[in-house]
Amino acid sequence: MIVPVQLSTLPVTPWKNGAGETREIVCVPSPDAPFLWRASIATLQNDGPFSCFPGVDRVITLLAGQPLRLKGEAIDHALTLWQPWAFAGEWPLRSEGIREPGLDFNIMTQRNRAAAEVRVVDDIQTPGDEGVAWVLQGRWQLGERQCEAQSGIFWHQQTPGELAPLTTDALLLVTTIVRR
């Protein structure tokens, strides 16, 4: 299954902790957990705590807005534009330094069942059987579909084929899911 997505058409739902909102791109089910893996885009409006997800690995990438800090016990990470950062879902983190609304891209995987690799690329990619491609800038040929910023595709149990830049300024956020 290969599905095109656009930010403007994704439904908005509250965060697990009620402190913000998210737009789910895809949620692949698991027989014994709420999901096997999940991709979403969250709105960053205020400093505050992250939702706790025990047994889940997360990767966050700032898509828009000013850099901010993610803080917790012995953790002080600067989250900057288009730089993926992986962390354990049970870490008690909070965001600090949000001065204007922003967006972040989130990938969550059940730690014992799947793993995610998230990269920003500017060249041709040939992804595996599960993942998400999100256009950061420029235009891309994502399999059979052309996409621009704030859009992309996800795929599950089927490769989309080649992901290729169509403009010289093209940047793509590519997530590859590997089942364990």
Task: Briefly describe each language-model feature range.
Residues M1-R180:
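Jelly-roll (double-stranded beta-helix
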